[in-house]
Structure formats: structure tokens, C-alpha cells
Amino acid sequence: MAIEYVDVLVPPGFEPSGVVKPVVKAINDGDWLGVMNLWIVRPGPALLYQERPPGGWAPGKFDGSVGGYYRAGESGLDCLREVEEELGWKCPLESITLIGRHLSVGVDSMDRKRHLVVTVFMTYDDLPLSRFTLDPKEVPAIYEIPVDDVVEAFENPQKKFKAYGLNCNRQPVEKVACADDFSYVFGGYHLRIAHIARKFASGERAFYY
């Protein structure tokens, strides 16, 4: 497997420092790194969630539709290659809206702290889930979860709902889920995204994030 190199970012603006490292070393060193999240809003409205693979970050949890590290020299929409790699889909650039940036610090399954500068985008898609071709190593399954279920789950941690989707073999899957089944991101990230997705589905495109 080819080694991926990333830019080390520095505060206060979290711009590239000029230091480039292999991504694993940068994670181990506790450096701030740039990542992209693309959220795909579905009819309903609903959000497309991917199931995280074993190992690494939030294994087995619901996570953003698409995500990945910016490689050295990349910024903005450069990271959209992840959409095709993970979902087998070429997302039209003109359909994507920048939501904003936030900082995130989390602990992965190897007990490493990940210091992330997350650039968040959103788009809308209403074609069948079966159109996506999942990379089984990165995305075991995808789920289409109604925004209302996401909101209720995070406003009431005891609330359970059924999530439906397709696995990497395009076979139907379902699971009974609650807030604990989502990746943990400080600051109510999933709840905020759900509220934004509701507005996005109604046509709003300007957000204070």
C-alpha cells in the first residue's frame, strides 16, 4: 500500500505549516490534520451514513456519508476523490455546498488521539442506494437514516430506531440503533448536521456553522 503524506496544520488559522509527514506518523505525533466530511442528504429528508470498518476510527459506528484526510497540497474539494473511492460515485461539483470548518479531537480504537480540522460539505442525492458501489475494506454498509430519527436519538439518548440500508454486496441490512451507535464527535456534531440537513432539503444553502 502506498504511503499517504499529509500537511501538518498549525493554529490559530490551522493552515499548512510547511511540514509534511506520513499520515500514520502524523497521527502518532498528535499533529493537527485536515479532513473532509461530505454529507449526502436524501429524500425524506434523511442522511446517508456509512458504517465504519473494523479498527481505526469508530469501528462499527455510523459516521458521515464520506470522509477522508486531505493529502499534502490538497484543500477544499480536492478530497472528493474519497467519494469515488468509498461509494463508487462521481458527485457533481456544482451540487456541493460548503457548510464550514470545526476542530475535533477523538480517540480511536488504537487509543491514539486524533486532532482534526474538519471541512464540512453537503449535497443532495435521490437516486437508489443500489447505485452506490461500496469499497468493502472502507465501507461495509451504508444506511439511510431519517433526520427526525437522528434528532430524536440525540435529544433522547434512550430512544431507539430501526436503520435500513445496504451492505457492500448490495444486500439489505437493518439494525436497531440509538445515539451510542453513532461515532462520537464533541459538540453535538451529528445533531447539528441533522438540523442543517433538514434546512438543506428544503432548499436553504446559507448556514452559520
Say what each PLM segment does.
Residues 18-26, 63-64, 79-84:
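Short acidic (Asp/Glu) patches
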Residues 2-37, 41-43:
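Acidic, metal-coordinating catalytic segment for phosphate/diphosphate chemistry
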Residues 35-69:
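A glycine-rich, hydrophobic loop/mini-helix early in the fold
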Residues 30-32, 60, 111-115:
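A generic structural micro-feature
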Residues 48-49, 65-99:
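The catalytic Nudix box helix
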